[in-house]
Structures are given as C-alpha cells and as structure tokens.
C-alpha cells in the first residue's frame, strides 16, 4: 500500500511536469506563429535531418518534462520513504534511532520534530526503568531488613528460652551426678549421656545464634573485625582456632562479603564438621585476595554434597557478587578447606603490592 502510494506520488510529479512542458511547447509555438506571423504549414514543413522541426521540439519538451518530473518525484519519494521507515522504527520501540537530515522544508521539519519526540520518549523510558530498578532495590532492601529483624527476634527468643533451658539441664545433670556417686554404673552412664547431649545441644545453639545474629564490621576494618569474630568464637566454642590475617586495603563492599563468608564457614564448621581445630588465613598473592578456612573435621564426599546446601551456596554467591570464586575441597575423615579468590585491581591494591608468604 505504502509503495503504491509513493509510486503514485512519483508518477503524479512526472505527469505534472510533462503537462507543464507540453503547455510551454504550445505557448512557444503560438508565440512564434503570432509574433513572427508564420504560416503553420511552414512550421510543419520545416525539418532537420528529415524530421519535422515541430516534432523535435515536441519530443524535447516531453523528455525534459518527464526527466524533471522523474528526478523531482524520485527525490521526494526517497525522503518520504525515509520518514516512513523511521516512523516504523519508532513504532517498534527503537527510540534511540535518529532520522538523518532531510532538508529545510516541511519534510525536514517533520523529521526534526520526530527526532525530538523520540528523544523525549527515550528519556521517559530511561526514567521509568530507573524508577523500576530503584523500586526493585528498595523492595530487596526492605526484604533484607525484615529478614534481619526476624532473625534477630528468633535468636533472642532462642537465647532467652531454649539456650537457658539447655544450660539449666546441663547444670542439673552435673548436680545429680554429685549426689548419685553410689548409684549403679548404668544409671551414672545414662546421666553422663544426658549431660553430654545437653552440652552438644548448647554448642549447636551457640553456633546457630551466631549464625542468626552475626557480628558485623560496624565501621571496623576487615582484619580487626575478623580478629574480634574469631576471638569470640574461640571463647564460646571448645575448639582450637588459629588465624593469620594480613592487612588489606580493599573496598567496603568486598570486606563485608568476605566477613560474611568467614561467618558462614565457621558456622558450618561448628555445626557439622566435629573439628577440633580451625585455621583462617587471609592474604594477597598474584594480584588476588585469597581467603582460606581449613578444619580437621570429619569432612564429606564431594560427590554426595547436596546441591541445595544453603551454606555452601551462600558462600559461592557472595564470592561471585564481588567478582571472585569459592572452591570447596573436602576429604572424608580428614577435613574441609574453603578457599575464596577475589581479583584485586590496581586502584584497590594500595598497600597490598607485596605477596603474602602464608598463602600457598
């Protein structure tokens, strides 16, 4: 339909210019006849190379009119075609496209106005997308805030109720053992089993509470925050904890993620590994920040680890969010090693140019 319309427009221009040429031809012949008082028979009899002169003039007029109409119509058709193609591009949602200059007449003015319209629509779309992103970020932040508050409430309730009751059970069983020294071995053994189970439950509860209500950096550097965290774990857990943490000048976001990864790793160790020793190492080597958490616990078979394991997935996701990778290596009966590698770019290196000799 559009091509037919443009073709019709071009042919109309050809017909118009050809008609004007014929009219001028008739006017010219009439002027020559009346002004020079020429006999029409003379004009008809005049020839050039055997071709009547009047026929030559007629052919020249028609040719000039046709050529002029074709060139003008084709140029007009091309400009309108460009304008229509551009409108279709805008209709398809590509508002970044701009119509090329089409001249200073009405068509060019229409193209300029369409470009201005596309620019305004593009800005409005960008503004809507920005608002949508901000809304999504706000919702995510609200969700995190609600989850954090709920975890704090749950941790507080567990500490005030279950943890205190477990402590009371442990104390009562210890007191009972003092008063039943003369009881049979079977009874004493069962009481000691209850005491041991209460102690294990207390350790599990401590690890769970630290996981639910974790310590945060709160303006401290990563080394200081990790040192306080590890010292707190050492006081609350019957396990040997060693660490070698290098000072690192990295961004706050990277520090927060690494701190959370260590928290998650320690929580997993205390809750599942049955380890007697944990080592935490943090240093820089080959333009990479490397974090290792190593325990001598029971380990697990790598091919049997659950893909849905929340702790391992959480650490891998946090490492990925800061452009790093988290690798887990475990040998059944020998322990587990979690290693996180994060690239350090030149602007982040600062004082970290020297490699850490503790990272192998």
Curated annotation (Swiss-Prot):
It is a multi-pass membrane protein. The keyword Magnesium does not apply. SUPFAM superfamilies: ATPase domain of HSP90 chaperone/DNA topoisomerase II/histidine kinase (SSF55874). It catalyses: ATP + protein L-histidine = ADP + protein N-phospho-L-histidine. It holds the Pfam family HATPase_c. Residues 74-126 form the HAMP domain. GO terms for molecular function: ATP binding; phosphorelay sensor kinase activity; protein dimerization activity; protein kinase activity. Its EC number is 2.7.13.3. GO terms for cellular component: plasma membrane. It comes from the Bacteria. Residues 37-47 are extracellular. InterPro entries: HAMP_dom (IPR003660), HATPase_C_sf (IPR036890), His_kinase_dom (IPR005467), LiaS/VraS (IPR017202), Sensor_HK_TwoCompSys (IPR050482), Sig_transdc_His_kin_sub3_dim/P (IPR011712). The keyword Kinase applies. The chain crosses the membrane at residues 16-36, 48-68. Induction: Induced, via LiaR, by antibiotics (vancomycin, bacitracin, nisin and ramoplanin), cationic antimicrobial peptides (human LL-37 and porcine PG-1), Triton X-100 and severe secretion stress. Residues 1-15, 69-360 are cytoplasmic. Residues 153-346 form the Histidine kinase domain. Keywords: ATP-binding, Cell membrane, Kinase, Membrane, Nucleotide-binding, Phosphoprotein, Transferase, Transmembrane, Transmembrane helix, Two-component regulatory system. The modification Phosphohistidine is found at residue 159. Member of the two-component regulatory system LiaS/LiaR probably involved in response to a subset of cell wall-active antibiotics that interfere with the lipid II cycle in the cytoplasmic membrane (bacitracin, nisin, ramoplanin and vancomycin). Also seems to be involved in response to cationic antimicrobial peptides and secretion stress. Activates probably LiaR by phosphorylation. This is Sensor histidine kinase LiaS. It comes from Bacillus subtilis (strain 168). The lineage of its organism: Bacteria, Bacillati, Bacillota, Bacilli, Bacillales.
């Amino acid at each position: 339909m559009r091509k037919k319309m443009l073709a019709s427009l071009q042919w109309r221009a050809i017909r118009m210019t050809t008609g004007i040429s014929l009219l001028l031809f008739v006017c010219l012949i009439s002027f020559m006849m009346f002004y020079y008082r020429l006999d029409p028979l003379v004009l008809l009899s005049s020839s050039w190379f055997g071709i009547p002169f009047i026929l030559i003039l007629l052919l020249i007029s028609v040719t000039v009119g046709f050529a002029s109409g074709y060139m003008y119509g084709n140029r007009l058709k091309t400009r309108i075609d460009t304008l229509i193609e551009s409108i279709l591009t805008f209709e398809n949602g590509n508002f970044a496209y701009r119509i090329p200059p089409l001249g200073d007449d009405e068509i060019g003015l229409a193209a300029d106005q369409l470009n201005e319209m596309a620019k305004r629509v593009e800005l409005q779309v960008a503004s809507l997308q920005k608002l949508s992103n901000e809304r999504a970020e706000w919702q995510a932040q609200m969700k995190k805030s609600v989850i954090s508050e709920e975890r704090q409430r749950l941790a507080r309730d567990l500490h005030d109720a279950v943890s205190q009751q477990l402590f009371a059970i442990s104390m009562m069983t210890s007191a009972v053992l003092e008063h039943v020294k003369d009881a049979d071995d079977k009874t004493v053994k069962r009481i000691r089993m209850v005491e041991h189970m209460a102690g294990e439950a207390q350790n599990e509860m401590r690890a769970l509470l630290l996981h639910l209500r974790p310590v945060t950096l709160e303006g401290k550097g990563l080394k200081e925050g990790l040192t306080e965290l590890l010292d707190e774990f050492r006081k609350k857990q019957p396990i040997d904890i060693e660490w070698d943490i290098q000072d690192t000048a990295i961004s706050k976001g990277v520090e927060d993620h690494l701190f959370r990864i260590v928290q998650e790793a320690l929580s997993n160790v205390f809750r599942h590994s049955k380890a007697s020793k944990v080592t935490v190492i943090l240093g820089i080597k080959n333009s990479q920040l490397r974090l290792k958490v190593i325990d001598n616990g029971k380990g697990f078979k790598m091919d049997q680890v659950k893909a849905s394991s929340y702790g391992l997935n959480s650490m891998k996701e946090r490492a990925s969010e800061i452009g790093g990778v988290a690798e887990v290596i475990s040998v059944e009966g020998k322990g587990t090693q979690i290693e996180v590698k994060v690239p350090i770019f030149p602007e982040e290196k600062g004082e970290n140019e020297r490699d850490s000799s503790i990272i192998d």
